[in-house]
Structures are given as structure tokens and as C-alpha cells.
């Protein structure tokens, strides 16, 4: 096969056919470490965002009026090793962060590699190639001679003629004009030479292990250089070392081994009827043989589009993602200006008039199709006349499927045809044109004349509705492996990285909403475990009677967890013993004024302040010492100060003798260690046994004072718990800390808990901290829930709560389709294998439907679930990624780019060792 590349200079491609193309990558994402990334779009978007995206695509199409660009939507293979490398980005090696021993994140990476091994994974990439025209370049006699020589050089075995500096400069200026026209539309960047070469390699290796796009994104190879005033490029002949055969023989279908043994396999080109194979009309695929093996691919041309389609169902290319196999598409565009298109419409109208006159002479009269055609032409003429910048899009669309065998390829082609047919699109797989349609998917090639019969005519806005220029993503570019994207038919990993959100000026706080048993606490535990395993710290306030978070911490973070049980009083949370200097005095005084219900500016408040200051100044400061100081003051003071000291000492004795306050006043207990950065990765504070006053009591002091002693002690102890969480979270901005608050309604029912949530949401980002909150209703997340950048919505059967959840995600709460999805489509009760489904929104405002996976790590699986009767001491078998996505049988291929994947795996382990 001959490659159409003559020279490559940056993103400019000189074709052997004499044309010059500028190749751009659309939606490129972050281009370098620390680079800014564009706002990406999820599968589920609000109507306003969809309209904005449609306007941008329409602008791009109209800005290229008069040109003939070509759009490539290519599915780049993803190797599990790539996911592993993304999981360790920003992770410090074990020797620096955890001392000697194995890094705790290694288990997670290995579990992810085991889960994804053998899965067919890909990511959608978009490329735009625009032919360039230059007055000084294309018309220069030496440029024309060089194009002609390129055709002869290949046959003579000689290198193509170099390109002069003048021509390179001229086409670069032409490319700048194209970029200026594209500005303001979609995000793009010039393609790299290695990426242009990858596009050809990808086309030739469909159905096989292909070179990874990740390597091409960072490669500096394949580009030409200007030397002595001319452009010299490396040889691209090796790219064409492949054999293309339409309807090639598949050993599995044609019993080629038996035919070879009988000597009946002839030389290539022997008549098909002399071989024991099917008719070529049934062998509508392209066999490509290269040095890596034999692959099969089928090219389908879009032959007919529906005359009218609703805006919600017009996203043809987005529907391709629903298939359980990847689909490439190539769209060759001819953009006709409005005036020229109107001339063509008038010509067609005149032809219709002539046909109508001819039919009038027949007894049957004029057929209804003529009336419909006249109506369509009239509507087209009116829309073209609406604005002078309108263009008519004449497109030839080629869809490509592939497989390791001809049978798999043929089955996928039939499935794609059926999907398009259900939407009133007709796709054909023409026999004899497979190679011609394949040629269209290569950069730098001319459009074969035989494919013009598949041209479709649309207005720019109508064509933009098909969604060819848009991609959908969910999650973050790197971080922890959370699960898979359920809006994609193939296995597409979803990753989130809450710890890196403050580094990109985003909030690291997350809110999770859903019914009981919908998976909120499992998702919280997975994220909290990933935070500490990646080098951060997690602080969890656990109110559950079974102390589920304490159980999880003891197994998941064994040896690195600290449990603070408020009811069992195993450690002390005495503020004077936990905090040094002014911080300890501040928290101690605030706790006592809250517990005793006294005014800070009263006589009792002044006496209490003096007692705290004196106790803190001693050699062994403690809350017990405050009681002793008050007793001493009551013995030596006189008057009102004596009475106040005696009264305060008596009240403190009442509180101190209660078991719930023992962890504050018992000097024999060891104090809590707040040096989390060096000794503890996970701190769990269990509040079982603590009671709080009802929320209505906080608005009426007289009602609050009448509450039981246990409720008043619980409120004051909660203040200290919040102080511990706040102090630890804001201690070291260099180390990310996440505060986990499950069932948030319990905490926000008090002023102290509400203040903690408020401070974490407003000040957490600048201190390298975030809030991870779970609730049954979005309203329970509080009035500041809009500051949460990460949002997840699980199954919510109540329609009113579901509406509030959708509004929390930024979606339309009145959308019936979304309401059905949330109320009955996410983790339906009783359906095995459907657990862990969420709608997830991340800081880039991309919302999608995901399935969360529990890694097959014993220390995690033994205690992460809370389903009664399902807690086991051995890890349950985890389904594969494809089985969890849906129960349909799915053909899989071997892991793509096996050698590259193995080297990536080795690099992961070496980095974390």
C-alpha cells in the first residue's frame, strides 16, 4: 500500500497528490503538566449547555465556508498499563512518604490491572484536516514540479523532492488564517507529526494490537526539518508495508487449514468459485495483513438520512458510543456558501416544475413525492436566505468497524446497520468499494470519485445536531480508578482525583445523595481509602451504631488508623492536652461556656476564663486541672467571684462524672494524637451514644436549657470533635486531608456541626482539604452545597427528592427521562450485579452514568459493605468490567499493545517500590 504522505512539517502534511493539509486535534485536553484543560462535556448536559455546544459547532462549520475539510473520529486503543500510569501520577515513592516497605497504593494499581486485563478499551479522539491554499505556494512552478515528482519518485525508488522554505512559510501563514477562523469555537491544537503518523498506523492495525496514542502524544519523531532552505523529511515508506485484500479469506470461516492441506489454496487472485469460500458479495470486509498480524474491518457508507428528526434524537455520532464495540467515522465535507447553494436549489426547483408538467399529461397525475420534494426545497431555500453566512454541508460519511476475525467484523457491521436503521438512517456496505472507503480514512488522501453517490445535503445547523464534533467524558484525567462509564458500550475506565482539585483551583468537596442501600457509604469508603493510600489523610465522623467506619479503618488502614470512640472513652479529647498554647485555651474556654451555658462577658465567664488561663500555664494543663483551679478559687476568693467559682466547680463536677464526658475530664486517658502527617492516615471519631438536642431547640434558649444532660453533653462534645476535624484538616496544606461526614443531617442539625461544614466548604480549598458528605436528600447538604465540585446521585425513588438531586447535579429536574433513570434505572432493587450505579459530576462539569467497583483487595472487601448478612471475612468474587456493564455477550480482544502495557506495568511497580 502506498502512503499519501510526502512531507510533514509540524501539523502541515504535504500529500503525494499535490495537496497540503493542516491537521488539528479537537478537544485536546491538558497538553503539558500543569497546563490548563478545556471544559469537557459529559453524556448528560443541561439544555443551555447543549445549545451552546451546538452554536460552537455551527460556528466552526460556517467559518470554513468554501473549504473541503475532513473530520476523523478515531477510537484509540487504551492499554491497562496506561490506566496504571495515570493512577500513580503525583504519588511519592514509598521511600519518601512511608519509609521502608511496600507503598499501599500498589495493591490498588495491581487490582485495577487485573480487572481491566483483556478488556476492549478505547477513547474517542477527534481530528480535523483542512486543505490549504496559498498563492505563493501552490502556484509556484517548483511546488507543482515537486508534486509531480512525488508520483514518479515512488515508482523509481527515489526520495520525494524537498519543499522550499518559501512554500513552507506560505502554507504556515495559510494555516494561521484557518486557526483564526476556528478561534472562538471548539478547543483545538495543531497535531504533532507522530500523531499524524499514528492516524495511519491506527487505520492499518484495526482488529490488532495497535501503537498507543499516548506514546505518539509525547514523541518527537516523524517530523521534517528545514535544512539549507529546503524541507527534508524522514521516509514514510514503512507505514505502507501492509497488504489490503477486499473479502480476504478468514481461516475460521473458510477452513483455510484444510484447504492448504489439500493443496487447493491457490495463489492470490484465483477465482473465488475455485476455492471453498463464500461469494464475494457476502464477504464485504477488508482484510489487512501487516507485520503484526491480520485484521478485518468493514466500511459502511451513510447512504440516506431521515428528512426530519427531533433535536433530542439527532445525535447520530453520540449513539455510536452505546455499541459494545468501537466505531471510527470519517466525514468528508464540502461546505458550499449560501449563495451558491441557493443557485443549486433554484435549478432543482426548475427541474421539479418540468417534471410536474410531464406528470400532468399522465392520467395518474403527479406523485406525492414531487410535492414533498418541492416543500423541502422551499424550506431549504428559506433557511439559506435567512443569513448570508449560512452554508450547505455536503458530507460523505464512512463508518468503520473491525475485529480480530472476519466473523466478528461482519457481526459488528450488521449490528451497526441495525442501530442506524432503527433511527431511520440507512448505511450500506458496498461490495467492491471497501478499499476506496478505507482510503478516505487516511490523512492526505483525495476523495475517490466513486463515493460521491453517498453525499448527503444538510444545512450547517442540522448537520451540527449529529454531534460529530463532540465527545463525552466523565471523571478526571487521573487519580483513583473508580469504575466504568455506563454510557459507553465498551469498557471505559472512570477516574477521579479529589486530592488534586485544590491544585487546579477547584473545590475538593463532594456530596453524595441517594436512598438507603444505594451505595453512598461504599463510595465514601472507596474514596477515603484512596485518599490515604495515595499519601493523604482521612478524618471520618461515624454516627452509626455498628461503628462501620471504625471497622473499615481497622482493616483497610491497619496500623495507620486511630479510632476515637466517644462512648467508650479509650482516649482523651481534652483540648488543653491536644492543642498547645492559645489554641488549647481557646477551644477549652469555648467548650466550657457551651457546656455550662454561661455568657463569656458575665462574672462567671470572667472567673472561668481566669481558671482556664491558670490551668493552661501549669506544667500539666488539662480540663481536670481547670476544675481544681475553680475549687481553689472558691476557697480563697470572696464575694461574687467566690460564688461564681463554687457554682462553676459544681456544674463541672456534674458533667465530669457522666460517662459521656469522661474522655474530656479523665486525666488518666492518653490524649488523641493529632500529628496525623507522621503517625496516622485515617482518624475515625465514632459518636454512637451521643445525643443532640432537637433542631428546633436551638432557636429557643429556654427550650435548649431544658434538654437532658446527655443531650447538652453531646452538643459540647460534638464541638470538640469538630475542632479536632478542623484542626487536623487545616494543619498541613501540603498534605491533602478529607473530612468524611456520612449521614450529614445528624451533624447539621446542630450549630456546631453546621459551622464545621460551612468552614470546610468555604476555606477547605486554600488549606488543601475537602468535605466528603453523604445524605438522603440534596437539601440536607445545606445551603452551601453549590460549593461542592464533585457530586454523585444514587437511586432515589421519591420523585421530589430525585428532582432535588438532579438540580444538585445541574441537570433539568423536570426531564422525565432523567427522572425515570434516577427513580428506577440506577441500581434497581433486587437485580444482581447492578449495585453501585451513580450519576457523577466532576469539577469540569461533565456528568455521566457510572458503575463503581470495589477492588479485589481483602483488607477492603472484608468490611466495606453494610448489607445485613453479606458481611464476610473473605473477599467476594468481583465481576469483570464487561459483565458489570451489562449482561450481553461481548467479544473481547487481547490486551492492546501488549509489550507497551507490560513495560507500563513494570514502570508502575518500579515507581512505587
Model-derived regions: residue spans:
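P-loop NTPase motor core of the ASCE superfamily
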Residues: 115-116, 580, 584-625, 782-913
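Conserved P-loop NTPase motor cores
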Residues: 492, 498-518, 522-528, 541-548, ...
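Switch/coupling segment of Walker-type NTPase motor domains
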Residues: 50, 73-98, 522-617
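Glycine-rich phosphate-binding loop of nucleotide-binding enzymes
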Residues: 14-19, 47-62, 479-564
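P-loop NTPase motor domains
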Residues: 51-65, 439-493, 575-762, 769, ...
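Phosphate-binding P-loop/Walker A region and its immediate neighborhood
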Residues: 109, 115, 201-294, 300, ...
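Extended, folded cores of ATP/NTP-driven motor/assembly subunits in large transport
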Residues: 1-452
